[in-house]
């Protein structure tokens, strides 16, 4: 490991195009509309890709663990279950924060479009402590 670099968190690779095809039809329609909205707002391709990756991984979890319910039916407890799954699978604070941001922004969009009365992410606390592990390296007297 290079000096001063943090360990990367474990990626949860659950993306599967066949599973994406099985998403709740109502959810899939809203997800596609959200992607168009991000493009129209001229978010960077990297941001759109990152958000869509997070959302697809979350929705695969919903498909497999939460009966493929519509995102309109999910509540704070359902979202907390997903975040707990991510954390126990090894996601670090930075990755967890992005997941929170991706899902929260999606619900903010749904609220703006009057699809949901409130954003279930609003009362979920986000991780604040950065738990990335940095390996410290010390120079010997000969190296100084």
Q: What function would you assign to each model-found segment?
A:
Residues 1-7:
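N-terminal acidic, proline/glycine-rich, low-complexity intrinsically disordered segments
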Residues 140-144:
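Short, intrinsically disordered, charge-balanced linker/junction segments flanking boundaries
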Residues 14-20, 31-135:
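N-terminal core-binding DNA-recognition domain of tyrosine recombinases/integrases
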Residues 9-16, 27:
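Charged interaction scaffolds used for protein-protein
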